[in-house]
Amino acid sequence: MKRHEAREKALQVLFQLDNTDLTVEEAMGHIKGQPTNVFYEKIVTGTAEHLEEIDATLEQHLEKWSLARLPKIERTVLRLAVYELLYMPETPKRVVLNEAIELCKTFGDDSSSKFVNGVLSKFTEQE
């Protein structure tokens, strides 16, 4: 499984976990496809484990928005990207931003990628 595909599957798992009572393992079990890999498991479990810190960080970088008001797909993409930016410094920032934008183009609408790009660009400039 390539990293892009791992991020797509991770996004699907995290999307399921948002406002549900599913465990990470249950949500991961609902995603079909190729066998999992270490990167996929790390970004799913890491994002879930650090969700409070990630959300607090995101709240600081959202202008005129609250995390609760964001559409679920944008919120999930932002959480996944911020996890990588904060806890996986070996991944270049530009790669994380590009992958987040591509995920929005695949799973969101036209405005999703622009919004996520703006939030993450602001985040990376300030960090």
From Swiss-Prot:
UniProt keyword RNA-binding present: yes
Cellular component aspect of the GO annotation: cytosol
Tree of life domain: Bacteria
Cysteines joined through disulfide linkages: none
Keyword RNA-binding: yes
Any Pfam family: NusB
InterPro entries the record matches: NusB-like_sf (IPR035926), NusB_fam (IPR011605), NusB_RsmB_TIM44 (IPR006027)
GO function term, MF aspect, one: RNA binding
Keywords: RNA-binding, Transcription, Transcription antitermination, Transcription regulation
Family membership noted in the UniProt record: Belongs to the NusB family.
Function: Involved in transcription antitermination. Required for transcription of ribosomal RNA (rRNA) genes. Binds specifically to the boxA antiterminator sequence of the ribosomal RNA (rrn) operons.
The protein, known as: Transcription antitermination protein NusB
Native organism: Lysinibacillus sphaericus (strain C3-41)
Chain's gene name: nusB
